[in-house]
Amino acid sequence: MSEFLTPERTVYDSGVQFLRPKSLDEFIGQENVKKKLSLALEAAKMRGEVLDHVLLAGPPGLGKTTLAHIIASELQTNIHVTSGPVLVKQGDMAAILTSLERGDVLFIDEIHRLNKAVEELLYSAIEDFQIDIMIGKGPSAKSIRIDIQPFTLVGATTRSGLLSSPLRSRFGIILELDFYTVKELKEIIKRAASLMDVEIEDSAAEMIAKRSRGTPRIAIRLTKRVRDMLTVVKADRINTDIVLKTMEVLNIDAEGLDEFDRKILKTIIEIYRGGPVGLNALAASLGVEADTLSEVYEPYLLQAGFLARTPRGRVATEKAYKHLKYEVPENRLF
């Protein structure tokens, strides 16, 4: 996948912190999530209590990290940021937990990647605001219970199915983020352009939005590249011509597909006669890992209606045939 269209963080996402919304009012989209979160935040503040633990789940690039920072901002408290893969030993987690002050937010990204020992230490911290640590080794080792300050854990995951039941059940607030509409992305792009001190036409913002795969991170990334084109051609505002020139350079088509996306669909249509084809067979034909194909490439193709999953395998849809200008088989059932 093009580095410009991956929903994962890349080097092209540096220097965008100033574009992040600082409050729920500034946050565009995810209306149901915002309503639930706003209610919980307001109630916690009115009662003077620590906010319940929050799990933010959904595909990458939709704003989970931004929401974690907004939670801390709305509560006017500190946020401590870490991630599942970084917390290797119980001592790593204990050091963070014992440094928290009352009401602080502990944000753990990729929380589904916590190892079992660290996760188990977290259980009592979440539930009782206590941790048990072992002092010494062998027969003389003993467990010491330490009280910690009440805090709010905010966990983010792109794969909520990998969370253990004991961990998931300890979150009082579970919020599922979904892909954004073109209208929402258009507003995000216009806001970003304004903050970058760039004028953008409405039709140009919509053109970028349609290529952003329902993901704000991609929308911002593409807007930055369009701004580069604006600078090079020495124009005074972003219009549709400038957007089209940029997308041509980036090899991104009108549906937001790049060269490898099109290769996936062409492989299914040409080699496997439109499918169904199993994940492993398709991955082998494309020269990628099966997990990479299912987790990185497929979500947008499924969401946009170019690909369908059936009990027998992946199938290219009628939309895929038409987009790639293949003749749709007369006897084919989609």
Curated annotation (Swiss-Prot):
Gene3D superfamilies: 1.10.8.60, P-loop containing nucleotide triphosphate hydrolases, Winged helix-like DNA-binding domain superfamily/Winged helix DNA-binding domain. Mg(2+) binds at residue 65. It comes from the Bacteria. Residues 181-251 are annotated as: Small ATPAse domain (RuvB-S). GO terms for cellular component: cytoplasm; Holliday junction resolvase complex. Its EC number is 3.6.4.-. InterPro entries: AAA+_ATPase (IPR003593), AAA_lid_4 (IPR041445), DNA_helicase_Holl-junc_RuvB (IPR004605), P-loop_NTPase (IPR027417), RuvB-like_N (IPR008824), RuvB_C (IPR008823), WH-like_DNA-bd_sf (IPR036388), WH_DNA-bd_sf (IPR036390). GO terms for molecular function: ATP binding; ATP hydrolysis activity; four-way junction DNA binding; four-way junction helicase activity. SMART domains: AAA. Residues 254-334 are annotated as: Head domain (RuvB-H). The keyword Ion transport does not apply. HAMAP family: DNA_HJ_migration_RuvB. This is Holliday junction branch migration complex subunit RuvB. It comes from Thermotoga petrophila (strain ATCC BAA-488 / DSM 13995 / JCM 10881 / RKU-1). The gene is ruvB.
